[in-house]
Amino acid sequence: MVHFTAEEKAAITSIWDKVDLEKAGGETLGRLLIVYPWTQRFFEKFGNLSPPQAIMGNPRIRAHGKKVLTSLGLAVQNMDNLKETFAHLSELHCDKLHVDPENFKLLGNMLVIVLSSHLGKEFTAEVQAAWQKLVAAVANALSLKYH
């Protein structure tokens, strides 16, 4: 189990309170699909995923990105209980969707990039470290069903 210090929790929650879920979620998922195009196979039903402008402007991508970040909000609220918090989503992504668990890490890294670009100087190295720790822990929790 990952332990978050009080300072890390404060850094994470202070940033989370400023996140526009639809905007950041859509950009995070869009970047994942553009930077790692093999991930597009999980989203074929979302329509046109080429060129990159089509991905970034796709309302289904934005909506799903918001859904992903809404789920991540559960991590922010339950940092001390990530395994149980994401047990159902781990099972869904493993058994039904067959998502390679490495993609969870890639998505987390895309989120950190988006947060940094949206928040600028407020997203300090210390804040980034806390967020990297959180997204890695969430990726691990989502991967548990695979083991």
Curated annotation (Swiss-Prot):
This is Hemoglobin subunit beta-Y. The lineage of its organism: Eukaryota, Metazoa, Chordata, Craniata, Vertebrata. The keyword Metal-binding applies. GO terms for molecular function: haptoglobin binding; heme binding; hemoglobin alpha binding; metal ion binding; organic acid binding; oxygen binding; oxygen carrier activity; peroxidase activity. This is a minor early embryonic beta chain. Heterotetramer of two alpha chains and two beta chains. It comes from Mesocricetus auratus (Golden hamster). Pfam families: Globin. GO terms for biological process: hydrogen peroxide catabolic process. Belongs to the globin family.
